[in-house]
Amino acid sequence: MKIEINENFCKGCDICIVVCPRGVFEKSKKLNKKGIYPPIPVNPEKCTKCNLCILQCPDQAISIELSQE
């Protein structure tokens, strides 16, 4: 599974960090080109694919790609 944040869409609202029940995301410690600290998936192995982050993201910046096993 691969969790991606599209930094072109993300505005750094941190909703994904707040709504994730498993603590998958943290705020990056580095500014991106837009001058924000985007969320990063630091614990992707904890993701249960509940899609709360995707559903709550106002900018549709999050995608989860399921690996074909």
Curated annotation (Swiss-Prot):
Task: State how the cofactor is bound.
Answer: Binds 2 [4Fe-4S] clusters.
Annotated residues that bind [4Fe-4S] cluster 1 are located at: C10, C13, C16, C20
- Per the record's keyword annotation, is Transport included, yes or no? yes
Q: Which PROSITE patterns match?
A: 4FE4S_FER_1 (PS00198), 4FE4S_FER_2 (PS51379)
Gene Ontology molecular function: 4 iron, 4 sulfur cluster binding; metal ion binding; oxidoreductase activity
Keywords, A to Z, come to:
4Fe-4S, Electron transport, Iron, Iron-sulfur, Metal-binding, Repeat, Transport
What does the record list as coiled-coil region(s)?
none
Provide the 4Fe-4S ferredoxin-type domain boundaries.
2-30, 38-67
- Write down the required cofactor(s): [4Fe-4S] cluster
Alphabetized Gene3D superfamilies for the sequence: 3.30.70.20
Where do the annotations place [4Fe-4S] cluster 2 binding? C47, C50, C53, C57
Record SUPFAM superfamilies: 4Fe-4S ferredoxins
Q: What is this protein called?
A: Uncharacterized ferredoxin MJ0146
Organism expressing this protein natively: Methanocaldococcus jannaschii (strain ATCC 43067 / DSM 2661 / JAL-1 / JCM 10045 / NBRC 100440)
Q: Which lineage? A: Archaea, Methanobacteriati, Methanobacteriota, Methanomada group, Methanococci
